[in-house]
Amino acid sequence: GKWWEGSFKQGGFTHGMTRGFPERGGRHGDDGLKIGREGMEPIEKFVDHAIAEKKPFFLWYGVFLPHTPHNPPQRLLKKYKDQGHPISVAKYYACCEWFDETCGQLIKILEKRNLREDTLIVYVTDNGWIQNPKRNGYAPRSKQTPYEGGIRTPIMFSWPNGGLAPANRPELVSSIDLFPTVLAAAGARCPNGVPGVNLLENLQKKHPIKRQGIFGESFAHDIANLKKPEASLLFRWRIEGKW
């Protein structure tokens, strides 16, 4: 899927679709961007390979939906056009549903192989929609802003045999919490000094997550100075309490 770090091997992955060549289309993930839009076969092959090797697996499904290009199937586009939405909005909504369908296909791949109950699924996204359909730039209070549309997104965990009871948690968490939490679920040791909080026990026992606040930074889309990252800094923000 979407992968900005060059070859998948640079991220420690053994398998992947992204070549990372410095060529047209390589910025977001070249061949990896086909996943979801053109089927799920590479994922099926990878899961089957892990089964054949009798090894656990980590799968990154960074599907390039509902990101542009907004080219949903006509059956989905018609559904939202018929509701009276502007064409740009109808395309976006249709791509959201298309993405949702591929998530269902991914779950079916696990179910078909009797892996679903023992597989931890983590859903995370980066930012909300650029909400002004008439503008190609960044809409106020949306992507790349310190406001809710830019930084408040859902994180979901599902692990049927992992003791995670259904719950809607209001506490503050951050994507930096995913690494220590996933390591704990896998029974692996977390390196010292890693930022983030291991949420596994909180999720299993419904213990409150005691955190006063979370912090973050927002940077400009284009880097101003490779040797001075702070030159592109736009915002520093802190969230605390009920938000």
Question: Where are each of the predicted segments found?
Answer:
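Beta-strand elements within well-structured catalytic alpha/beta cores of enzymes
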Residues: 57-62, 96-99, 103-106, 110, ...
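Catalytic-site neighborhoods of secreted/periplasmic enzymes
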Residues: 1-44, 139-142, 212-215
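C-terminal cap/loop subdomain of S1 sulfatases and analogous C-terminal strand-loop tails that border
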Residues: 129-135, 163, 171, 176-179, ...
